Amino acid sequence: MSEPVLVIDNGSYEIKFGESGWDQPLRALNCLTKDKYSRFHLSNQTKKMRDISQALIRRPHELGQLVSWELESEVWDYCFYNEDDFHWNLTHDNDTKDHHLVVSETLMTIPELSKNMDQVIFEEYDFKSMFKGPVAQYIPFYQGQYQDDAMTAAEDKKTSSYKDFQLVIDSGFNCTWAVPIIKGVPYYKAIKKLDIGGRFLTGLLQETISFRHYNVMEETILVNNIKEQCTFVPPESYFSSFHNKMNTKVEYVLPDFQTSFLGYVKKPGKEKLTDDAQTLLLTDEVFSVPETFFHPEIAQILKPGIVETILECINMCPEVVRPLLVANIVCTGGNFNIPNFHERLQTELQRQCPIDWSCKVHSPQEKDKSLHGWESMKDFANSDQFRSARVTREEYLEHGLDWCTKNRFGYQQWL
């Protein structure tokens, strides 16, 4: 398309944004942070904090729903008009009035909150046109390769019918969604939600470290960094990893706010520490926390795990497409950066599925799996489907908010 298209993956933890012709998006934390000195840091300014202790974080999303456009618009302005941090400025490239927009929205968004997004996009930012939808809806448009796509031409021809049927597992900051896609359309009657995501893992790790080592209940940024650097999913089972926990132990050096502000993982060997250095020796914590995806009872949660949630989702789909969905499961979201996650998921699902079903779990080739959604949105923005499906500013002004929600972006008619 000759006209510029801005693509925004508006995640509850991090915003990925950029133009449809870019190879990589820009990234900004979707939050406002208050440090212990009562100074406020917006979005990526949080990464420049010298003292992360006792930081309070406020996000525009609550329980997965975008509820605070007062804060979200501040973060968007920071992204659009901050040339110092991003070396890109929307005012240098025409402005929002000359841009089309592709943006993500939470699944099952409350209609009134969805109307708020339409109103802000068309009345405050004046975008030329807009298309919005959940990240899972864009995944079929992904033009990149998956890690296990090295198939022969014969195999590719054999499985070509699967590509119209996908089961998208979107595991992000707030929760994990299982979304069946049939002929490019989410099958809303079978969508299932697991209330375990990145926020939950960070909170559980906080409680575990506070009980066993130091009190870190007010050190959210520190514990989140420990989670990202140290945790992994047991490749076979929790019990086998527990027996070998001393072989996978991790020693994490806590920040001293002079040489380190976030801490780091101590390399085994000759690395010497100062006399006053404080360390955490993490053994079974590094794998027991992510294991809650498969066994929530570890955290005293009496709900189905991710495997049971996926099977329940599949069983609510038409019987004829169930084996096709199982054969084409696509993983997206930041939690799939945890090592061994998608491999373990495939192993556990294959055990639970009928013996004549072939279970295949695909993971994108991107090193950071959280970028998969933005890449899919970018490919959609460059397609003809975007031109025919978008809502223009003129249509919005003519028909109004209710028309957009009911006839174009609402999901209620699919239920």
From Swiss-Prot:
InterPro entries: Actin (IPR004000), ATPase_NBD (IPR043129). It comes from the Eukaryota. Its main location: cytoplasm. The gene is ARP6. Component of the SWR1 complex which mediates the ATP-dependent exchange of histone H2A for the H2A variant HZT1 leading to transcriptional regulation of selected genes by chromatin remodeling. Involved in chromosome stability. The keyword Signal does not apply. It comes from Kluyveromyces lactis (strain ATCC 8585 / CBS 2359 / DSM 70799 / NBRC 1267 / NRRL Y-1140 / WM37). Coiled coil: none annotated. One of its GO terms (cellular component) is cytoplasm. This is Actin-like protein ARP6. Component of the SWR1 chromatin remodeling complex. One of its GO terms (biological process) is chromatin organization. Keywords: Activator, Chromatin regulator, Cytoplasm, Cytoskeleton, Nucleus, Transcription, Transcription regulation. Pfam families: Actin. PANTHER family: ACTIN (PTHR11937). Belongs to the actin family. ARP6 subfamily. It is found in: Cytoplasm; Cytoplasm, Cytoskeleton; Nucleus.
